[in-house]
């Protein structure tokens, strides 16, 4: 069934824009380098036509602690995601995550997720679902810190990725696979990108990330296909970044 653009853009907001000199093939390993900061802007399109919205990403690092902000502005939707976590090399430890969405005719939704690793418990607060707690029995991620771990694994040359996380109030596992490479046109030029697909049970839905080795494994495009009639994508317009 066809879904309106505001619904699809809202779905795409669950796909944070991270997580990731010479272009190298997918099987090659690259030495890991941590991110110091990122300022990026993405254009939003619906069925390959401009949707009149932009998404902005900022990443800031201080003493191996990261603050990430992702904002989208659209005539039908305003949304924001924030995350704070620590990183020692590829060991990513989430501390907090929050998300808010305000859509036309749908009101506002708010979610906060806090990780207490000393007591091994995570607490989720949601203005619609109430409070929920989770036992941290393993290295869980939130929807943003997950992509920093994925960037490490892609730089190591991994082809199949799997991560436990707390997502939409539930314990879940997200799986991804590198399916090839593709050239992507962006506001900064053309880049050869690794094509990373999320593995889903519903084959009609498809989420694809395009990760550019030439830009130190940062994402240059995200595409979410809800059905054969509806696809939302976010493509890099500009980016300024630095590695540590």
Residues covered by each model-derived region:
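Hydrophobic, well-structured mid-protein blocks that either form specific transmembrane helices
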Residues: 107-153
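N-terminal secretory signal peptides that target proteins for export/translocation
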Residues: 1-8
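Signal peptide processing junction and immediate N-terminal pro/mature segment
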Residues: 24-28
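Acidic, serine/threonine-rich low-complexity disordered tracts
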Residues: 29-117, 156-244
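Bacterial N-terminal signal peptides
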Residues: 12-23
């Amino acid at each position: 069934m066809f879904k309106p653009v505001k619904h699809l853009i809202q779905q795409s907001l669950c796909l944070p824009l991270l997580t990731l000199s010479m272009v190298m093939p997918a099987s090659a390993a690259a030495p890991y380098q941590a991110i110091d900061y990122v300022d990026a802007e993405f254009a939003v399109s619906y069925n390959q036509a401009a949707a009149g919205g932009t998404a902005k990403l900022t990443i800031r690092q201080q003493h191996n602690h990261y603050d990430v902000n992702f904002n989208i502005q659209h005539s039908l939707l305003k949304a924001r995601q924030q995350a704070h976590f620590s990183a020692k090399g590829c060991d990513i430890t989430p501390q907090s995550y929050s998300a808010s969405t305000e859509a036309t005719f749908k009101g506002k939704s708010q979610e906060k997720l806090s990780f207490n690793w000393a007591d091994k418990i995570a607490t989720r607060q949601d203005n619609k679902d109430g409070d929920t707690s989770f036992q941290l029995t393993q290295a869980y991620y939130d929807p943003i810190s997950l992509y920093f771990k994925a960037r490490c694994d892609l730089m190591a040359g991994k082809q199949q990725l799997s991560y436990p996380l707390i997502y939409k109030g539930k314990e879940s596992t997200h799986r991804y696979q590198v399916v090839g490479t593709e050239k992507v046109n962006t506001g900064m030029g053309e880049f050869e990108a690794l094509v990373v697909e999320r593995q889903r049970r519903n084959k009609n839905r498809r989420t694809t990330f395009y990760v550019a080795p030439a830009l130190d494994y940062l994402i240059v495009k995200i595409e979410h296909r809800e059905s054969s009639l509806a696809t939302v994508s976010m493509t890099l317009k500009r980016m300024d970044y630095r590695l540590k």
